[in-house]
Amino acid sequence: MKLYNTLTRKKEEFIPLEEGKVRMYACGPTVYNYFHIGNARTFMVFDALRRYLIYRGYDVTFVQNFTDVDDKIIRRANEEGVAPEEISERFIKEYFYDAGTLGIEKADIHPKVTENMAEIIAFVAKLVEKGHAYESNGDVYFDVSKYEEYGKLSKQSLEDLQAGARIEINEYKKNPLDFALWKSAKAGEPSWESPWGNGRPGWHIECSAMAKRYLGETIDIHGGGGDLVFPHHENEIAQSEACSGKKFANYWLHVGYLNVDNKKMSKSLNNFFTPREISEEFDLENLRFFMLSAHYRNPINFSRDLLEAAKNGLDRLYTGKNNLEYLLENAAEREVSEEEKNFIHGLQSFKNQFIDAVDDDFNTADGIAVIFDLVREINSHISEKNSKKAVEASYDLLMELTGVLGLLKREAEDLEEEIERLIAERQQARKDKNFALSDKIRDDLKEKGIVLEDTAQGVKWRKL
């Protein structure tokens, strides 16, 4: 498997630190609001990458943090007249809800900044002790001039960065590029005791400290959105490597922007959509399919027309799945013919093509193209005349390859929730004496193969 490493600007063979194991960290959200679908793209890519690494036989430990103390959280808390932790806890819950609707599984560990304060303070103290950071009026800054490789991730020299740095009035910093590791307390803001007085951590140090605590001083894969290359990830490398004297991460992966009218989707431009807004028009699995149908490093221009096209593509895969499920229910346990044996053997080539495609810098777009080729092959060879074994082999491979990407998961659980929702809607219609709507819901469900039975214990349903 090869991955494009932002650090080296080239594809490299993926060789984990420890054979068969992967330690991966992705920067998570600052929890002051609902995340938008531009953020969702990054979360989905790392979710799918983790699934694929597991599929390829790796034991993956995946960490994605929550930034639960931040200026934006404090600002919103003040606007609403509540404590900052009330805001962060609310939007952590909302994150998990929205992530779930997009098929994003929970990371192995979701650390919060506020639960790792001792580790953060110890990290800052070590940097001060080693001469890489200095205290100034209750703040602690990282001394960029003491880290010679600063700029290696973003491919910028220290001289160029200094020349381009905005002239800011900060008498406490030695250099405009020096960044805060610890910020002294302000009235009315959350703070923690430290050797430099009460305060709270800077943004960059949080991820370094949590990655070290949960994954070690050197990790396999670190990543996030493309907007994090500089300064966030650049600063993480500087402080982590200055602290440990070791390489921080072997592979740096960054996800391309999701654009609207060729401009990056962002809250600051107010050109964003949340998953909840998209769900008013589309099943959110269509959004996942749309995102994974492009290479993760390429920017995507978002539009409803493109999402509609993605829906049509995903519908074709569902049609293939549904056809095979119908054939499975009706297939005869007959002997496998020689032609079928050749067909079943030939299915392996699609699995190999899929792995070859996705192994090449996690190219899910080409992987999905292989899945469509597989469906076409199945459609041209499988019918009611085939043995159950041939149908099963086709179905199993389709579900295996789509499952790796978290696709074709709708049915089962989602179907049950939808049925229960429609039953509740029908009950309300009957209470309101809206019998036309009540009958329509019953008939619509019957068309989908679901029969409702009114009993003394309430409405029950069964499949035809």
Curated annotation (Swiss-Prot):
Database matches in Pfam families: CysS_C (PF23493), DALR_2 (PF09190), tRNA-synt_1e (PF01406)
- Which domain of life does the protein's organism represent? Bacteria
Q: Which family does it belong to?
A: Belongs to the class-I aminoacyl-tRNA synthetase family.
Note on cofactor: Binds 1 zinc ion per subunit.
Signal sequence, renumbered to the chain: none
Cell compartment(s), UniProt: Cytoplasm
What is the native source organism of this protein? Alkaliphilus oremlandii (strain OhILAs)
Q: Which GO terms describe its biological process?
A: cysteinyl-tRNA aminoacylation
GO molecular-function terms, A-Z: ATP binding; cysteine-tRNA ligase activity; zinc ion binding
Cite the SUPFAM superfamilies for this sequence: Anticodon-binding domain of a subclass of class I aminoacyl-tRNA synthetases, Nucleotidylyl transferase
Its cellular-component GO annotations read: cytosol
Q: Which reaction does it catalyse?
A: tRNA(Cys) + L-cysteine + ATP = L-cysteinyl-tRNA(Cys) + AMP + diphosphate
Q: What is this protein called?
A: Cysteine--tRNA ligase
Listed cofactors: Zn(2+)
Q: Which PANTHER family does the entry link to?
A: CYSTEINE--TRNA LIGASE, CYTOPLASMIC (PTHR10890:SF3), CYSTEINYL-TRNA SYNTHETASE (PTHR10890)
Q: What class of enzyme is it?
A: ligase
Q: Where is this motif: 'KMSKS' region?
A: 264-268
Please tell me which stretches of this chain the record labels as motif 'HIGH' region. Answer: 29-39
- How does this polypeptide assemble, per the annotation? Monomer.
Q: What is its main location?
A: cytoplasm
Task: Output the lineage of the source organism.
Answer: Bacteria, Bacillati, Bacillota, Clostridia, Peptostreptococcales
Q: Which InterPro entries match?
A: Cys-tRNA-ligase (IPR015803), Cys-tRNA-synt_Ia_DALR (IPR015273), Cys-tRNA/MSH_ligase (IPR024909), CysS_C (IPR056411), Rossmann-like_a/b/a_fold (IPR014729), tRNA-synt_1_cat_dom (IPR032678), tRNAsynth_Ia_anticodon-bd (IPR009080)
